Amino acid sequence: MEYKLLIGLEVHVQLGLKTKAFCGCKNDFGGIPNSRVCPICLGLPGALPSVNKELVSSAILAGHATNSTIRNIVKFDRKHYAYPDLPKGYQISQNDEPICENGFIFIKTSLGVKRINIARIHMEEDSGKSLHLLSNDNQSYIDFNRAGAPLLEIVSQPDIRSGEEAVAYLNALREIFRYLDLSECSMENGSFRCDVNINLLINENDVNYKTPISEIKNLNSFKSVKLAIDYEESKQKEEWILYRKTLESVGKCTMGFDDKKGITVLQRSKETISDYRYIKDPDLPLIKLESDYIENIKSHRMVELPFDARIRLQEQYGLSDFDVVTLTSDKNLVKYFEEAALTSSEPKKVANWILSEVLSVLNEREIGILDFNLPASYIGELVEFILNGKISGKISKEIFLEMVDRNVSSITIINEKKLEQISDKSFIESIVIEVLNENPKSIELYKKGKSHAVKFMMGQIMRKTSGKVNPVLSNEILMNKLQDV
């Protein structure tokens, strides 16, 4: 049986704006239940919404970042459905005229680079949150703090073909929104949520069939996304063989995902567009966006995005795939690296140092690069001292830790503790000759092929110089002298 997966993702990003989408209530996570509400987000009679300008500008910025076409006229619609945490009985959203359309981003997987097309990005408000308590009275409570929070929904075309591609796409989107400072994109606190639409396109005897679409709701981790896709792929193949149900005959249904069992569970048959009874919101007028305003947002707020940054870093500095992926996980880490690289002749060595020693300190202290007080130029300077033989690689790590603790440069510590490595050839040669004269037995062992003899003599050289001679140069001179005896 020949088939391919058709996967489209609907991603909800809660924007990190100061206030909610259509009222002045503070937009924040958590807090005392129902402490950040007003007549507008509670849907009380006579309360009139007004559009948060930052919601519109954030949507425009997201459109630029995803290569989308941005509309000049903004229209809001009412999406009607009944649910306890939706106080108005409808959600303010956008139906047939989303602010952004026909965009795309690139992802990279084990199969290479791929373009994923984005059907639309639209603005809407979030619902409240239902809290189901495990108690004898079997009651549920509703917190409306989240009601009216500003959301962008990004809907991809069904261009994704595997769980790996789905996770890569989600990662790419999350990186974009974080780079633009639009959202924390935390799945833990609900500011980055994902629904998966999945079915199979099956070819039998040159005839194509589509299996029913499963929309898997509220997946709470990238791991769950991949597991749900893998399970649905297997399930839909099996159901096709047994029942041969098609999209035309069955349609679309809504599924949940059981993390513990690793299976999808039917929740309900999917509503159609007509079930939501979309109408234009009469309380919100059309908004005209001038082309200059749209372009101004791009020129003032757009930054280099992760995919482009990775290409540039590889071309400019010769970094590996691993290096650039790790560095671009945080735009501030990229900035730190490039500032450090300015003071060194070997940018790749600087990258290695940051990705090992600096990140180790950040992880140990549970801080980000913005909270790391050591100037980037100090790292480049330290790496340069290692490269030119001023200090050894071993002592450099001790120096670095003291630099971090004291927030001083490496040269300060080197001068204070007289740690500069000795690279004077004539001096090292005199020490080597001295060690050879004192250890004739070690010379005999070396001639018999005993490699430990060299290690012993190197140890004697380091002991006589308190470990301050250049070990590479010392070893080179020692080996040359051993050839002559």
From Swiss-Prot:
* Segments forming a coiled coil: none
- Gene that codes for this? gatB
Outline what the protein does. Answer: Allows the formation of correctly charged Asn-tRNA(Asn) or Gln-tRNA(Gln) through the transamidation of misacylated Asp-tRNA(Asn) or Glu-tRNA(Gln) in organisms which lack either or both of asparaginyl-tRNA or glutaminyl-tRNA synthetases. The reaction takes place in the presence of glutamine and ATP through an activated phospho-Asp-tRNA(Asn) or phospho-Glu-tRNA(Gln).
Name the enzyme group at the top EC level: ligase
Keyword Lyase attributed: no
Q: What is this protein called?
A: Aspartyl/glutamyl-tRNA(Asn/Gln) amidotransferase subunit B
Query: Which cysteines form disulfides?
Result: none
Catalyzed reactions = L-glutamyl-tRNA(Gln) + L-glutamine + ATP + H2O = L-glutaminyl-tRNA(Gln) + L-glutamate + ADP + phosphate + H(+); L-aspartyl-tRNA(Asn) + L-glutamine + ATP + H2O = L-asparaginyl-tRNA(Asn) + L-glutamate + ADP + phosphate + 2 H(+)
| Family membership | Belongs to the GatB/GatE family. GatB subfamily.
| Oligomeric and partner information | Heterotrimer of A, B and C subunits.
Enzyme nomenclature, EC number: 6.3.5.-
> What is an example of a Pfam family matching this protein?
GatB_Yqey
Q: Name one GO biological process term.
A: translation
> What PROSITE patterns does the annotation carry?
GATB (PS01234)
